[in-house]
Amino acid sequence: MKDAAPAPDEITEPSEPRARELLAQYIAAFEIADAAALERVLRHDAALEMVGSRTWFAGRTTCLPYLATYVLGSPGDWRMLAIIANGQPAAAAYRRGADGALRAFGIAVLTVTPTGIARIVVFGDPDLVTTFGLPETLGINCES
């Protein structure tokens, strides 16, 4: 994973407009389940890792099929709120359950550069969402 990381001088700070723009585009892509939009914000060498899992993906052409097949689902399955975690742009993720309620899923922390998202680290722990002062659920009729 270390070889896949961008150089420290390539990382864009979360307060910079480009970092906020990439985070907003990432969130929008997830909320409308648009793999093509997600492809546009990921760097060609993007890495995806899920904390607690031994599996990780390196390269946009490896990350996207996994996300499109197993994660994105249908438009409206996800709702994300922009946050800052560990000093980086991040999203608090909520996933729609069978009853229609959006329940906390976890946190996705992004490493962004001027050329796109270089790394996504997913902490799939619903309890982390509430540590940011956010609710456990967003309700059945929550609009994105």
Language-model regions, residue ranges each:
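Low-complexity, glycine/alanine/valine/leucine- and proline-rich hydrophobic stretches
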Residues: 64-144
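Solvent-exposed, charged amphipathic helical/linker segments at domain boundaries
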Residues: 1-73, 77-79
